[in-house]
Regions:
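Alpha/beta enzyme core
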Residues: 4-298, 304, 310-323
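Catalytic or ion-coupling anion/metal-binding cores of large enzyme and transporter domains
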Residues: 171-195, 229, 233-235, 272, ...
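C-terminal catalytic subdomain
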Residues: 300-309, 314-361
């Protein structure tokens, strides 16, 4: 009889996926199993996704990075998207979310799942309009459920559903004045559907039906935050927290049913509120893994939002966020190109690594210490090997090499290099500067 990762963990069974994750994390298998059983770690791994190399998300594990990809009606270039996927995997992203909103979405989704070793996530409500070829207001609750089943059958490892907003939220949004209302794309569609049809949110009303589908294929739920703040002024407001309370309740229901769940979080949050947001989520959601978009710590940096978001991501990770959704320089401006994707990934790999060091993840700082030793002896090849982006590090140094270079220094300091001077001084060698 098939059991989900959560059911197996509760039953005391260490699955082959848990063994892989435990080895990657250098963690005892039984410790990992107990964390999965407690709902504090998830291993998104659809039984149909046979090419996956599973990763764990949650307590005591390395911080993971997700990359959002997908075409829109204005930019449809499948070859370009495939190249972005390949680049994301090469650069170390642990997850890709397929957010296609135009064209034959299923062909790309199936190809992605068939070949990708990383976990794949989707937002089924995007695909509902395309798959059923209906306008939003014409879709039925059954249409949404059918799309979820289709994604599960195709092998999607986790799905984002915005189950936390209800008819009550409509009144809250109208009465509680926000500067930016709802900025979640999926959340705005659910809000609009409820407004047009007069019906309750189908992802909330039929949550038990969704759990049945997820359990059948072992799809992890990513409970989306429709009311995440889209600007600093809306951070940590009534709408955000009220929804988070409901998401925590839904996560507990999923756990009781044997379905893994994680919680999505903000958004745009001032730096001084990030720790508080992480602690509120920890309390309300019983330690379920927290998946955050950034958060962005200022609203005024379009073109540089990979930086504003990575700052927030590092702090969020330090205080407990387990999963960071990358942000690119194109955020708020355009569909990201391949260079934007790389910039976003590198910013968030740095943020995730910095958070792991701050949280004391075992062995997280080893590579930093190895880099320091390589710098101490001016071993450039060893430094490149330690770098998150060896190709870029090598390219920068070699394109601006010092005129008098014997493999020791760089053009920043040349013979004024502090490391070179100290090495020679400690070895009682003559220090030539001119």
């Amino acid at each position: 009889m098939f059991m989900t990762q959560l059911e197996s963990a509760v039953a005391g069974v260490v699955t082959k996926e848990m063994k892989v994750v435990a080895e990657k994390e250098r963690m005892d298998e039984e410790v990992l199993r107990s964390l999965v059983a407690a709902g504090k770690v998830v291993i998104p791994c659809n039984k149909q996704h046979t090419s996956i190399s599973p990763e764990g998300i949650g307590k005591r594990l390395r911080t993971k990075v997700n990359v959002n990809l997908g075409t829109s009606k204005d930019v449809t270039d499948y070859d370009s998207e495939i190249e972005k996927v390949n680049r994301a995997i090469r650069l170390g992203a642990e997850s890709i979310m397929d957010l296609y909103t135009h064209g034959d979405t299923r062909i790309f989704r199936r190809k992605l799942i068939e070949t990708s070793p990383v976990m794949i996530g989707t937002v089924p409500i995007y695909d509902s309009v395309i798959h059923h070829q209906k306008d939003l207001g014409e879709l039925t609750a059954q249409d949404f459920l059918d799309t979820i089943r289709l994604h599960a059958q195709d092998g999607v490892d986790f799905i984002t559903i915005h189950s936390g907003i209800t008819r009550k939220t409509i009144d809250q949004i109208k009465n509680h004045k926000r500067l930016l209302n709802i900025v979640s794309r999926g959340g705005s569609l659910v809000f609009a559907w409820m407004s047009m049809t007069g019906h309750e949110n189908p992802f909330y009303e039929y949550f038990d039906e969704i759990l049945k589908i997820c359990k059948e294929y072992d799809v992890t739920l990513s409970l989306g935050d429709a009311c995440r703040p889209g600007c600093l002024a809306d951070a940590t407001d009534v709408c955000q927290i009220e929804e988070l309370v409901r998401l925590g309740e839904l996560a507990k229901r999923a756990k009781q049913y044997g379905v893994q769940a994680m919680i999505e979080g903000p958004g745009h949050v001032p730096l001084h509120q990030i720790q508080m947001n992480m602690e509120i989520q920890e309390s309300l959601c019983d330690g379920a893994p927290f998946y955050v978009l950034g958060p962005l710590v200022t609203d005024i940096a379009p073109g540089y939002d990979h930086i504003t978001a990575a700052i927030g991501g590092a702090v969020a990770g330090m205080y407990g966020a387990s999963f960071l959704c990358y942000v690119t320089p194109a955020e708020h401006l355009a569909l990201p190109n391949a260079d934007d994707v790389k910039d976003g990934i590198m910013a968030f790999k740095i943020a995730a690594h910095a958070a792991d060091i701050a949280r004391g993840i075992p062995n997280a700082r080893d590579i930093d210490d190895t880099m320091a030793k390589a710098r101490q002896v001016l071993d450039w090849e060893a430094q490149y090997a330690c770098a998150l982006d060896p190709e870029r590090a090598r390219s920068i140094r070699e394109s601006r090499a010092p005129e008098e270079d014997h493999g020791e220094t760089c053009s920043m300091c040349g013979k004024f290099c502090a490391v070179r001077s100290m090495n020679k001084a400690l070895q009682e060698e003559y220090i030539d500067i001119l």
